[in-house]
Design a protein with these regions (language model features):
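Short hydrophobic/aromatic patch on the recognition helix
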Residues: 43-53
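Short helix-capping/turn signature of helix-turn-helix
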Residues: 53, 110-119, 159, 163, ...
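Short amphipathic alpha-helical segment with a characteristic S/N-K-E followed by hydrophobic residues
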Residues: 55-60
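Hydrophobic alpha-helical connector segments
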Residues: 62, 76-103
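Short, basic, alpha-helical segments at the C-terminal edge of helix-turn-helix-like DNA-binding modules
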Residues: 64-72
């Protein structure tokens, strides 16, 4: 990359490209994203885009990783001053996840999802150790975790919610919000003894 950007400017531009790319993915779908238009949107040349990302496919992977990190960072905003997560904080975070839906898969067509799964490194998408680590981290952050926490059930419920968000047209629209609310309450009940205030 030419030295026309400082390291800070380079990182800010990389983030801008990913955020704008995710917006386009949500509104237009993956196949309709045009690198030329995205670069123009961010006031750079198409060639400069490829100094950040080797290909459109790598760009999509980086968006996914960025959104996952953004979701992890958001979790910290729901903790108390001592870094602990109350039942209410966990509930609010999970609702943010479902409402914000930073899951790239939710915006891909079924054929794009399959293509993406086939080219992603083996074991990355479905990795049991990662699932266990995530649930252990959540329980460790909780103010009052259940001694008999049902981590695997909570993990599956979270994945069910994420999967449901990829096909919202299968569900009754009028009960969607209440359904997500019940799902979220059940996840919280699997992990903490505290009531949601």
């Amino acid at each position: 990359m030419p030295k026309i950007f400082t390291d800070e400017e380079r990182e800010a531009l990389r983030i801008k490209l990913m955020e704008r790319g995710f917006e386009l993915l949500k509104t237009q779908g993956y196949k309709r994203i045009r690198i030329e238009a995205l670069a123009l949107d961010c006031y750079i040349a198409k060639g400069t885009f490829y100094a950040f990302f080797e290909s459109k496919s790598e760009f999509r992977h980086q968006i996914m990783l960025y959104e996952r990190q953004r979701a992890k960072d958001a979790l910290l905003t729901y903790t108390d001053e001592d870094g602990k997560l109350s039942a209410k904080g966990l509930y609010q975070y999970l609702r943010w996840l479902f409402d914000e839906n930073p899951n790239v898969f939710a915006y891909l067509t079924p054929s794009e999802q399959q293509y993406f799964l086939n080219e992603w490194p083996s074991g990355y998408i479905e990795h049991e150790d990662t699932d266990h680590a995530t649930m252990n981290m959540l329980c460790h952050m909780l103010r009052k975790p259940r001694t008999d926490a049902r981590r695997e059930c909570a993990c599956n419920l979270m994945k069910m919610g994420a999967a449901a968000l990829t096909v919202p047209n299968l569900f009754l629209h009028n009960a969607w919000d209440e359904t997500l609310d019940l799902l979220t309450q059940q996840i919280v009940a699997c992990l903490t003894e505290q009531e949601i205030d």
